């Protein structure tokens, strides 16, 4: 409910020593439709005005070239926007979260779509649930790729396997981009699980706060517009 989430949000803000009186506005990016209205009401209760809702129709600082822009995840667009504003070149943006996504932005700032894979944790959970003789392990990088026991073999398959998948996709996407006449893309990675994979990935730039920076940029670009707000 709104009240339950408000207690959690107030607690997080208190832990960060942030006063609501300092808030000039709010941005809401939601990929869970049933919670969008809940958090819209919550934020309006907290700051006295509705948040700006992230939408493909708002100013993102990039253009969108996909079959159905409205279906592209807002988190993917926000990450792409933040990365492009920093690098201003062709990009592959990798987000290691619930899903693992690799998205493409051209050198002239056009979001071209990308790749969506099951996330590392989802894959691990399915493996542990469906394979009767396998058991849950911590997602830590083993010392060697070749595991001498089931625990290390599982860790190797998950960590090195996902790292290899991402590296392979980066190479394939890069080839496709270059064939279209674009410069070799810069790879940018973010997400809660990115740090676990970073040591085995090749030539990627890590930004743990890419999404937050993207939301702030979105606010700056849209704070004077009414589009995207709940009216």
List each model region and its residues.
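Short, surface-exposed recognition loops or helix-turn segments adjacent to catalytic cores
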Residues: 96-99, 142
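Short beta-strand scaffold segments in enzyme catalytic cores
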Residues: 93, 100-105
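Nucleotide/phosphate-binding catalytic cleft detector across ATP-hydrolyzing
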Residues: 1-91, 108-231
